[in-house]
Amino acid sequence: MPLIQGQKPTACLALADGTIFYGKGFGATGVTEAELCFNTAMTGYQEIMTDPSYAGQIVTFTFPHIGNVGVNPEDDETANPVAAGMVVKWDPTEPSNYRSAGELGDWLASRGRIAIGGIDTRRLTRAIRARGAPHAALAHNPDGQFDVEALVARARSFSGLVGLDLAKDVTCAQSYRWDEMRWAWPDGFTRQTEARHKVVAIDYGAKRNILRCLASAGCDVTVLPASATAEDVLAHNPDGLFLSNGPGDPAATGKYAVPMIQKVLERSDMPIFGICLGHQMLALALGAQTVKMNHGHHGANHPVKDLDTGKVEITSMNHGFAVDSQTLPAGVKETHVSLFDGSNCGIRMADRPVFSVQHHPEASPGPQDSFYLFERFATSMDKVSSAV
């Protein structure tokens, strides 16, 4: 809830331009600095905080009631929260949900993540929209003592996400196999036993639900680190290559990811499917360029138009960089665009089963309009296999 008049604040959010927000702290104590973004999703705060794509970012939730259903281990998209911090309008109260295994504040505290509640998130969101994703410092001190000048200085000293390869910080340390499928009532998560295709997934910060969707589409998934080479990929003799989501500047990650993708394209006709950062990696490998967005797209209600069918899909998005559609080379077709700002949301090669999308078809959280893309990937592998 907002601070009562006379109540001492226990958290402070300082923007690089000197704007200060005071509120009630929860989660871990300390100070962190990062890029500040906002997310418009009404549900899925746990999935958002554990999405590796949020590395280097403090997330402002525009929906006022966050934490109401608590937390549980099934909703983690990776082992621990990756987002640097959390900003909400109302600090969490006692959770109420049959799946809840704990409180949001305790969960954040045990995982070293700072949060602030009781501030005007509408004002903050407007500031983010107007100024672009600002750099910020977030502090939580139960004593209520803050060196505001030092916090502003820390916000100003944050290097930003441009030029940062964050995929290397969130990728897996070694390869592993994934066979867990999507959650379904009443059994929950089940194991895949009848795979049709072998798929290598490159982990630039892969969400668990993406891997579940691949498994549910009949893929026997082997996950490799972001630094995997073309030789590493081809050694598994896969039927398809998947490029995952992830954080940071695609141009920085592309320094080692792009040569791998280009070599795979040269040496194999296997289908390739990319999501989010994987979409940007594929675009760079095909000769396009990426650009930093003003405040990015973060939410679960983003309309995207499929240019092939004219269909509009409501999607989940989480990206601060975008593919510049004006730089797409001949032979690469733009397939999807955002209906918010016209930015690129999908590409495919004209003569090969190679495609990618900027949005998140796996949702988690969000709508399921784009689940068909996983089946499209599986179908493309079926066609290649039958042609051999």
Regions found by a protein language model. Name each.
Residues 1-236, 248, 364-366, 376-388:
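RNA-binding accessory domains that recognize and position tRNA/RNA substrates
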Residues 25-27, 64, 318, 349, ...:
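Residue-level structural signal for beta-strand termini and adjacent loop
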Residues 114, 198, 271-273, 289, ...:
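Proline-centered loop/turn at the N-terminus of a beta-strand
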Residues 191-195, 266, 348:
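Short, flexible hinge/linker loops that cap or flank conserved catalytic cores
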Residues 198-202, 315-316, 355-359:
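Active-site-proximal beta-strand elements of phosphoester/diester hydrolases
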Residues 240-325, 366-384:
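Cysteine-nucleophile active-site neighborhood
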Residues 310-352, 388:
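Catalytic beta-strand/loop cores that center a nucleophilic Ser/Cys/Thr
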